[in-house]
């Protein structure tokens, strides 16, 4: 009986250890696997700077296009689509964190006007749900429901991302008005070149930190290189570490300059930002416009009928 209890305790202890290890792994890995929105959320209170620049560009250095499509106007308390397109060459492969090549992921940030927010699931139509797929959107901050982020997600499946947006109702929110509002978007494809702490990722160019002669190049067992540079002036040695991923451009015995690229640029992705405008339309104004158009059409009809009646009278008088 004691043997069984001891065995049960050991089994329970092993299970707990495995669970704790898995949890620690997930916590440690989360910032890297969810690099696009998480890094920005951790470092910036607002993703759009006063200059208009979206902060994702601080880590994704290459400039790439992005496109957004929204309706010209929407009525209050209605759900509409904001479609973000992130184009790139589907054939290219990016350098992964382990130095191997893999497919590109994409991510996006959508900055809506105050009052606009992600539509609740029960308000989203089946057609829009089909376009959304398995995407999961989140608020940039719990207090900033008008700023949405998504990603990283597979680029081959989500080059086009559909955000379901709920427009505000000025009748229930006094700080909302029937006006034209700007919408800002940022979209990236591929990994970034700079981490939040300013250090380089392996998806970047590595330059020489000293001028001199390349004395020795050691290829590491897990990938990457250790390059020893001898300064020609005072003979002191400088060691540059290259992570796995970038291709080496220099060889032993070669003379190099300060800041000369030691590797190729492996980055095939990039970040882009754009904007659009949307009008929160007053239903009474729409009704007034329809009434005005209807009155014009009726006036035209009466004018035509009156003209025909006048022509008949003239024809009748001519016969007499």
Swiss-Prot record:
Which Gene Ontology molecular function entries are recorded, alphabetically? Answer: electron transfer activity; heme binding; iron ion binding
Q: Where in the cell is it found?
A: Plastid, Chloroplast thylakoid membrane
Q: Which residues cross the membrane?
A: 286-306
Keyword Ion transport tagged: no
Cofactor binding mode and count: Binds 1 heme group covalently.
**Please, one GO biological process term?**
photosynthesis
Keyword annotations for this protein? Chloroplast, Electron transport, Heme, Iron, Membrane, Metal-binding, Photosynthesis, Plastid, Signal, Thylakoid, Transmembrane, Transmembrane helix, Transport
Its GO CC terms? Answer: chloroplast thylakoid membrane
Q: Which Pfam families match?
A: Apocytochr_F_C, Apocytochr_F_N
Gene3D superfamilies referenced in this protein's UniProt entry, alphabetically: 2.40.50.100, Cytochrome f large domain, Single helix bin
Look up the domain of life of the source: Eukaryota
Cofactor dependence: heme
Q: How does it sit in the membrane?
A: Single-pass membrane protein
Signal peptide range: 1-35
Residues bound to heme: 36, 56, 59-60
Instruction: Write down the PROSITE patterns for this protein, in alphabetical order.
Output: CYTF
Role description: Component of the cytochrome b6-f complex, which mediates electron transfer between photosystem II (PSII) and photosystem I (PSI), cyclic electron flow around PSI, and state transitions.
Q: How would you summarize the oligomeric state and partners of this protein?
A: The 4 large subunits of the cytochrome b6-f complex are cytochrome b6, subunit IV (17 kDa polypeptide, petD), cytochrome f and the Rieske protein, while the 4 small subunits are PetG, PetL, PetM and PetN. The complex functions as a dimer.
Tell me which family the UniProt entry assigns to this protein: Belongs to the cytochrome f family.
Q: What is this protein called?
A: Cytochrome f
Source organism of this protein record:
Phaseolus vulgaris
Which lineage? Answer: Eukaryota, Viridiplantae, Streptophyta, Embryophyta, Tracheophyta
Question: What gene does this protein come from?
Answer: petA
